[in-house]
Amino acid sequence: MVKRLVVTAGEPAGIGPDLVLALSKEHWPHQLVVCADKKMLAQRAEQLGINVTLLDYDASTAPSPQQAGTLVVEHIDMPSTCVAGQLNEENGHYVLKTLERAALGCMKSEFDAIVTGPVHKGVINRAGVAFSGHTEFFAELSNTPLVVMMLATEGLRVALVTTHIPLAYVSKAVTAERLLKIIDILHRDLVEKFAIAEPKIYVCGLNPHAGEDGCLGREEIETITPTLEKIRQEKGIHLLGPLPADTIFNEKYLNDADAVLGMYHDQVLPVLKYKGFGQSVNITLGLPFIRTSVDHGTALDLAGTGQADTGSFRTALQHAIELVEKKQ
């Protein structure tokens, strides 16, 4: 059965529109609906020398496979002009409107998944909206109390206990209650969305050497280890850890792990991006819909040049398609 996926172009001054337009160069097995300003897409296509027919989205028609040379567009009006590579805070609210339209469409079952292009957090905040990222935005919009940020590439999935918070706040944020909820969401989605019957989750410690028996920090002794043991006993989830972050990515562990759970953003993401930058995908777990995204930023210096690497965007779309098809 043909599905309908919605794609957001992200920050209009960045490479998001370039990545979206690149999708028009080939056939796709499902319908792709792009949430963006149609005029902006037409201008960027001309700048890039891409010959594409932009079709108006009609929700009343049945989805059909995406044909090369076309893009279906759900027009969201952009209030100010856009020049590739030049941020304009007057368009900050426009970016949020594209995200809102896509998410609400998924929540109404109009769309089967969201694939998001890169946004610029700074320009949205300068537009007067407190915005820390897609993950938190979609969680608030869908009234989801807690979501889990996962990134994946070939041979590695990593998830986070904390996401976009200052490093100084991480220790207090890693609580038994949060660990219980994060691991529950991670395990459930590995089973339900990734079709892994009995997931094996490897868990990082917080401190260097996972605390070195309390000599380098007591969070492992007081919080992480007892919480993992409680989950093992009560839920039977296969957990290994806490392990030192500088050894958990050893091949002997990764060959067995279905996911690695890190305590904070820069503990695990540098490893994943080194392993698969440009070929990795951001997946939000715990939402009432499927959402994937690129693993990189807006790359303003590449916008409109034709030099943007489409690898991560294609990977995000392919992962979304795989997850949608597993639901069938």
Curated annotation (Swiss-Prot):
Subcellular localization: Cytoplasm
Cofactor(s) of this protein: Zn(2+); Mg(2+); Co(2+)
Residues binding substrate, per UniProt: H134, T135, K273, N282, R291
Enzyme class: oxidoreductase
Listed GO biological process terms: pyridoxal phosphate biosynthetic process; pyridoxine biosynthetic process
Domain of life from the UniProt record: Bacteria
Keyword Nucleotidyltransferase: no
EC number: 1.1.1.262
GO MF annotation: an example: magnesium ion binding
The keyword Transmembrane helix is annotated on this UniProt entry: no
Binding site for a divalent metal cation: H164, H209, H265
One Pfam family it belongs to: PdxA
Keywords noted in UniProt: Cobalt, Cytoplasm, Magnesium, Metal-binding, NAD, NADP, Oxidoreductase, Pyridoxine biosynthesis, Zinc
Matching Gene3D superfamilies: Isopropylmalate Dehydrogenase (3.40.718.10)
Pathway(s) this gene product operates in, as recorded in its UniProt entry: Cofactor biosynthesis; pyridoxine 5'-phosphate biosynthesis; pyridoxine 5'-phosphate from D-erythrose 4-phosphate: step 4/5
Main subcellular localisation: cytoplasm
GO-annotated cellular components: cytoplasm
Cofactor: how bound: Binds 1 divalent metal cation per subunit. Can use ions such as Zn(2+), Mg(2+) or Co(2+).
InterPro entries documented for this protein: PdxA, PdxA_fam
Catalysed reactions, semicolon-separated: 4-(phosphooxy)-L-threonine + NAD(+) = 3-amino-2-oxopropyl phosphate + CO2 + NADH
HAMAP family: PdxA
Functional summary from the UniProt entry: Catalyzes the NAD(P)-dependent oxidation of 4-(phosphooxy)-L-threonine (HTP) into 2-amino-3-oxo-4-(phosphooxy)butyric acid which spontaneously decarboxylates to form 3-amino-2-oxopropyl phosphate (AHAP).
NCBIfam families reported in the protein's UniProt record: pdxA
Additional comment: The active site is located at the dimer interface.
Subunit structure, as described in the record: Homodimer.
Protein name: 4-hydroxythreonine-4-phosphate dehydrogenase
Organism listed in the record: Vibrio vulnificus (strain CMCP6)
